Amino acid sequence: MADLMSDTYEYSSLANKYGNFYLPAVKIYINGTDILAAQKLFLEEISVVLSLDSAGSAQFKIGNIYDPPSRSFKSGIADKFKPGTIVEIALGYYSSTTKIMKGFVYMLGAEFGNKNLLVVTVMDVRKLMMIGGSRHVLHNVKNYSDIFKTIMSAYSRLCTPKVSATNDKLEAPVSQTGTDYDFIMDELVKKGKSDREFFVLGENAYFRERPKSAPAVLKAEFGRELLELEMDYSYLDMEIQVMGYNSYEQASYIGKSKVKSGEPQASLLTPTPVFAYSDPDADNQEKAARRAGAIADLADRQSKNGRLTMIGLPEIVPGRYVEVVKLEKMVNRKYYITEVRHRIGGAFFVTECDIGGFA
């Protein structure tokens, strides 16, 4: 099975694999069986959203199952997709597909009009973490990566943790209040306590170092697989300061990290503007400096944005770079993908990507 987080591809090999991208294909697995093929169901359309920053989702609509004489859907079809059912989704062309999502049926509904459709919404494990209720826990471990493993162990039916270990040497228990998702995203990621990303792809839940540079999943050419491109970068010139305190040593620490756009710009303010953060867990100089660096890296990525539209390619996923080549000097670079939207309907398959940083 392909490793979507590390494998690289050539356009020619993908065209060969997918029969020149002519006939989109979808497989929806329940208990290892492609339910579309097994039940001979007609898929009207499907959209899959994969993201670094929010729960992944998929919505698909099934047609030709409403029976007007009996005024009901065909017997047993809706029951196959009852909420809570675990689902895997694969996209591709012809008989060649690639699994890109594992989740659970979050919502089941219907649409009646020109077409009478059963509508299924699938969410990945992060949605379950959001709605699983608040927790009040003291995590008595040495590293933030250990906290992540502990939290994710409750969700083993939906995912397997893939963890880049941290070396935090925590001196005191870490308090969690709120949902598992909010704790990981707000406390561990956004506040820079660990220089890690948390996201889900397929059956894996990643807690990994942010790649500042990595091989691109694909080199894309405009007019070939790349259909549209928008990119921009904004003015950025600041210093991040993280202030911590060690109660045992009765010592305070300040970690500093300057971040400035790597693109051409004129400096406007002297001295450099300072943005200060307080972190009680930054109980030594190394931790304070590391957290300042993590916040600065995030600010740098957020200052570089854009959007790509490509032919449908399931290999394009968040957490990877796509390299644009042979277009224009300003835009010929590697773009970090933060969100992907795959859409299939009839004979079309389009992949749209949001950019969150580039190299």
Which residues does each predicted region cover?
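An acidic/polar, Gly/Ser/Thr-rich interaction patch typically located in mid-to-C-terminal regions
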Residues: 48-80, 225-359
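Conserved "cap/hinge" positions at secondary-structure junctions
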Residues: 91, 209, 326-328
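Short, compositionally biased
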Residues: 102-111, 211, 335-347
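Short polybasic amphipathic segments
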Residues: 23-32, 204-206, 240-245
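Assembly/oligomerization scaffold segments
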Residues: 1-125
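Short beta-strand-centered interaction patches in the first periplasmic/extracellular domains
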Residues: 2, 6, 107, 115-127, ...
